Structure formats: structure tokens, C-alpha cells
Amino acid sequence: MILPRPLYSGTLIRRYQRFLADVRLDDGTVVTAHCPNSGSMKGCCQPGSAVFLSLSDNPKRRLAYTWELVMADGYWAGINTGLPNRLVREGIENGTVAELLGYERIRPEVRYGTNSRVDLLLEGPGRCWVEVKNVTLVEGGTALFPDAVTERGQKHLRELMEVVRQGDRGVIFFVVQRGDGSAVAPADAIDPVYGRLLRQAVTAGVEALAYRALVTPEEIRLTERLPVLAGE
């Protein structure tokens, strides 16, 4: 996936109210950017960090800039949670995600469960329901999800277990949008309920996949599969 051009480099001043970030651009201008990430962004919102912003030409937008990348522990991290669904779809279509090949159709945002929309539904033959999660927290060499308590994420795991019980395929897909982290594991210290449900889901037949993304100011793309440490 090619990122918007041009991107504007700067330095993070602060992130606040979840969806706002003040950034000093390289020319000295201070702007407020939209932060497209509702998590805690632990490890990715340190004041003074190098960042890249995209700029919208939509005059109706309240905030013209969107925060896209941050330098975290020497690696560019993609913090835009709107991108992973597109990355996974692109990875399926170009053959990178071998585990999800062989389906005739890919449909986004299909209703299922209780007032939910699955990120991707793969159809023909059979059906595969795919929930995609963005991972940017890395500690001790392991990528961790979630970075904040997520009742929505817990609900998705329950719904994936139900589609598997009904005979369909269910997949929880972790996209690690940074270059470090050799595996993915549930962040039990942050959301122990999510960790318990992930392990329960895997035992029930939900497939847990994780891929690392190459993240640069020019592009983001899935590159390699990582193990998911979801055992007891």
C-alpha cells in the first residue's frame, strides 16, 4: 500500500483526548492533527517522537492533517487503525497471506453477530469471517494486543467462536505495524479478559494469524507471518 503523498514530517508535542495530536512540523509550524487510533498507543505517543502526517484537501474536514507514522524504539510504526483491513485484503489478493487464499469473493463490513460488522468476509467455497486488529505495542521483543481494555475486541472473539460453532471458518488477524517483535501475544496485564477469551477462542477452533508489516514513509505492506502465543 502506497501512503499518501506527500507526507509531512514533524515532532510530536502531545497526544490528547484520544483523537487529537499537536505536532511541530519541520518548518516550525504547530498543527493539530487527527489521531486515527482509539487505543492507549502505549509506547507510541512519547512527546518528542518523530512523526509523519498526511494532508487532506477536503475543505469540509475540521482537521486537515492525519497522523500516520511514529518512530518507536528505532522503528516506524503505523498508528492509523483504518489501514490494517486494507493491508490484509491487499495481502490476500497479492498472495502474501497464503492461509486465506482460495476464496472467490472478499466482502468488507458484513453484518454478523450482535450489531457487529466483520472486517472481511471471504466466500466461495464456504465462508471465512476475518476480524483484523492493529498491533503497535511491543515489550520484551513481543508484540502485545490490546494496548487498552477492549470490550469491543472481547465481543469479536465471542462472535468468531459462534461462527466456528455454526460450521464456518473464523480468523482473528493481528497486523503488527512496526518492524520489531518476533511474536504476538495477548496483553494479559492490560486486558486479562481479552487474553482469556483469545485462548478460549483458539481452543474452540478460531484461527489466530499474525503478520508483520514493513512500515516506511513510502509504503506499508505485509511481509511475514509471526507466531501467535495463545496457549494456556
Curated annotation (Swiss-Prot):
The lineage of its organism: Bacteria, Pseudomonadati, Thermodesulfobacteriota, Desulfuromonadia, Geobacterales. Belongs to the SfsA family. PANTHER family: SUGAR FERMENTATION STIMULATION PROTEIN A. CDD domains: SfsA-like_bacterial. InterPro entries: cNMP-bd_CS (IPR018488), cNMP-bd_dom (IPR000595), SfsA (IPR005224), SfsA_C (IPR040452), SfsA_N (IPR041465). It comes from the Bacteria. This is Sugar fermentation stimulation protein homolog. Gene3D superfamilies: 2.40.50.580, 3.40.1350.60. One of its GO terms (molecular function) is DNA binding.
